[in-house]
Amino acid sequence: RDRSVSRGLGDVYKRQSYNSAELGKKLYKEEYGEKDIYIFNSRSASVGETLIAMKIQECEDSGMSFQEVIDTVEQYIAGQNTYFVLENLDTLRKNGRLTGIKAIVASALNIKPVMGAKPEGIICQLGQARGMKRALAKMADHIIEDLENPKEKILAISHCNCEERALEVQRMLLEKINVRSSFIIDTAGISTM
């Protein structure tokens, strides 16, 4: 089929990614002519974008029209949730979300922030805990509390060189919820699809 469906990262990179996607769309059309191309705002990153790509493929495989794919995937994106725990607070300190003093104190106390994304893709702190094990348990509690229609959902977990933690989070969640399917993927450094 002569059509493409894509989008960059969430709101943090929205303008740059959107402009790059629009430029790519324009260049493609200049070279190959008019095609159906739609740019999604994934409001996610990493495994969230992987899930979106899987949903697009599922829609394509089922024979949906271009507009049906767009509508279905937009609805799918709106129902996605992203959660994560930070190993250290350097990123929050460097981007100004946490002062240097607070980062030092939190690090000394082994405080791990539990983070998530709002529906519009904005990252926010959902809670915190002392130690990684407690933080992961708190994250799992947030996931379970926020989850709607679990039997329709795919639980996708990404990790960066920490498969044991990913498996533990998967175990904690699958003991309490019944999802359509579940998988774990490894990422490396800054990760997008």
Predicted regions and their residues:
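Hydrophobic/aromatic beta-strand patches that form the interior of the parallel beta-sheet core
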Residues: 7-8, 38-40
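Single conserved hydrophobic/aromatic residue that forms the stacking wall/gate
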Residues: 2-13
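Mixed-charge interfacial surface used for oligomerization/domain docking
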Residues: 17-27, 32-38, 44-54, 58-192
